[in-house]
Amino acid sequence: MDWESFYDPATGYTLKKITNEEYIRSPLFEPLCLGVKFEGEQEYAVTQEDLPRFFNMMRKHQNKIVVIHHHAQFDALINSYHFDFRPKLILCTLSMARALNFPRDMSLSLDSLSKFYNILPKTVPYGLFQGKRWKDMDSYLKKLMLDGAARDALNADEICDRLLPLFPREELISIDWTIRAYSEPQLIGYTQEFEEIAKNEEKRKADLLKSLGLTKDLLTSNAKFAEILDALGVEVEMKANAKGQLIPAVAKSDSFMKDLLNSEDETVKLLAETRLAVKSSIRETRAGRMASMSERGPMTVYYYFCGAQNTTRHSGGDKMNWQNLERKGPMRKALLAPKHMKLIVVDKSQIECRILNAASGQNDVVERFRAGEDIYCYNASMLYGFPVNKKDHPTERGTGKQIELSCGYGCGAPKFVSTAALGIYGPAVNLELMEAMTAVKLYRDTHSEVVAQWKQGDIILDEWNKIGHAGTDFTLMGVKYKDGYAILPSGLRLDYTTTTYDNKLRQYFFHHKKSFARNVSSGIPEGEAERWEWWYRKGYRTLYGAKMVEQLTQALSAVDYRQSCNRVYLKYGLRPAMSSHDEAVFVVD
């Protein structure tokens, strides 16, 4: 099934300007026609006049119907919101394609996949019907649209035929509940609370600026911010931009900026915090968007299935990332169950850590988990030399937690110091570099099997560099890597066929995502800084043994998580209303 609907770029009523949810729930929305292809039958299109009759028939049999869409969130929300149609199973060829290792730079649109499989291309005349209602179209334009919609439905069906033999059956269930979190939403948003969050965030930023006696433009300008730091006696680090020019290293991701956030000088620390706060409008924008959504209906939770490259985890979409809502933050608290129903929050406790140690063969740590021992207190006791418990030693236990959770992927002492200062794993701690080195060494000495997997990852990379990916067969953490692909328990694969080695930088890279910069030179620059920038702009990221272990652990955790959700869905009919990497929120009676 494939929908065609009214849109009007002249007034901003277009998916380029607003979210899918706002577009579909808008009073301006008008379904024009629906392309349909039943199995074993000729494709056709349902006219606007025939849509009510068509869906009356479909609803009578919806418990037996499997529907195929390309970008199912869009089409399935139209089905449910406007026509109360909820089939037995929803398949999405876009979600399937995203999981099946197509080239990173290839578009996965219906038209692009049609061309890839040598299927006739799309013919919908979008340029001819923009701004036109069904009643305003002549018979010729209507025929063009109906033929194009029918062709799109046929193409989605043929693409599905090609993808299904490659796709794990269990993951089809995962796609279904991922789509329904958006197309059949369950959570209710507390509108007033979202509006209050947005107002409070604006006030917080204004108060920060007032406390410093500065204006927003002074902090958002890199040059002016650097001048303020210089006046305070802070030596500003510089970095090369894409053109090779030196600029202040004051981006959020720069290590110098992270040092400022951890500065012992409270004024410098406040300056850095305020700069990041006023440069970002994410919090109030998100709260405002959620407030608007809650006024239109239940909260449509959008996830890209396998959106996170080389981990197969979900990622955010439709201008919202539901994955990174603070678990104890005000926005989460403003998400409610429908009247007379309840929310159940289920968490796969320490899943990454458990899988990392179990798959690596670090059996002593696994046994401590099995015995119910607090592994974080155990680490802290080893580090500090006295018995640590959760009640009396929260700071020390936090460091023990950081040892277990951050050192498993090759974390070094400098990063350990900066992470401790952020208070991610417990109360913020200012560690000396030597203390961090001791903590890192403790992990590596007590997790020799995990460290061995890092080394195995390095060996695999070196072998790929020597002989290529084709014909290779390796094992990492019990998972087979054949021909450059890691084959997960579900049957999905992680793609490492793009790994390459830069001899000058002595660094491996892999194609992580689409190139975000146009006109990047085809040849690699000579200068070291320029080479790093070139790889980054081409969509590549660094890769090393411990990073491969991290990606594989997260991928295995994602598979385990989806399998658990599938079991609950199939046995009890409950699907996640919202989920994160290791947590699911269910709505129950």
Residue map of PLM features:
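Short active-site loop/helix that positions an aromatic residue
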Residues: 73-84, 97-101, 225-233, 349-363, ...
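Function-dense linear segments that define catalytic or interfacial modules
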Residues: 305-389
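Conserved pre-motif C helix in the palm subdomain of viral-like polymerases
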Residues: 151-157, 349, 545-566
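Active-site palm subdomain of RNA-directed nucleic acid polymerases
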Residues: 163-175, 560-584
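Active-site-proximal helix-loop-helix substrate-binding element of RNase H-like nuclease domains
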Residues: 29-55, 59-164, 175, 377-385, ...
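Conserved "right-hand" nucleotidyltransferase catalytic core of DNA-directed polymerases
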Residues: 1-4, 8-13, 18, 26-33, ...
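Metal-dependent catalytic core segments for phosphate chemistry
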Residues: 19, 28-30, 345, 352-386, ...
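Short beta-strand-to-loop capping motifs
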Residues: 586-589
